[in-house]
UniProtKB/Swiss-Prot annotation:
Organism listed in the record: Bacillus subtilis (strain 168)
UniProt-annotated location(s): Cell membrane
Membrane-crossing residue ranges in chain numbering: 8-28, 37-57
Superkingdom field: Bacteria
Membrane topology annotation: Multi-pass membrane protein
Assigned keywords, A-Z: Cell membrane, Membrane, Transmembrane, Transmembrane helix
Domain TM2: from-to ranges: 3-54
Gene Ontology cellular-component annotations: plasma membrane
The protein, known as: Uncharacterized membrane protein YozV
Coiled coil: none
A Pfam family that the UniProt record links to this protein: TM2
């Protein structure tokens, strides 16, 4: 079963733990999360995560749901 991802939780994880890619693991993007961990020593993932933090906060709930909660709503429509 797929759980619904929360936009605010994703934004907070990106802000506080973004350099390690924790928000990517939360959103189900495991491959990207591993890349963040591999390159965390460069500081680049921290910069990208801060940009993603801003995008999460400024983006619409519908856009977030389309991108990260697609499978959740697909399962709900089948039930």
């Amino acid at each position: 079963m797929v759980s619904k991802k929360n936009k605010i939780v994703a934004a907070l994880l990106a802000f506080f733990f973004g350099g390690l890619g924790i928000h990517k693991f939360y959103l189900g993007r495991v491959g990207q999360g591993i890349l963040y961990i591999l390159f965390c020593w460069t500081g680049i993932p921290s910069i990208i995560a801060f940009i993603e933090f801003i995008i999460f906060l400024c983006g619409s709930e519908e856009g977030f749901d389309q991108k990260y909660n697609f499978y959740y709503f697909q399962q709900q429509s089948k039930a």
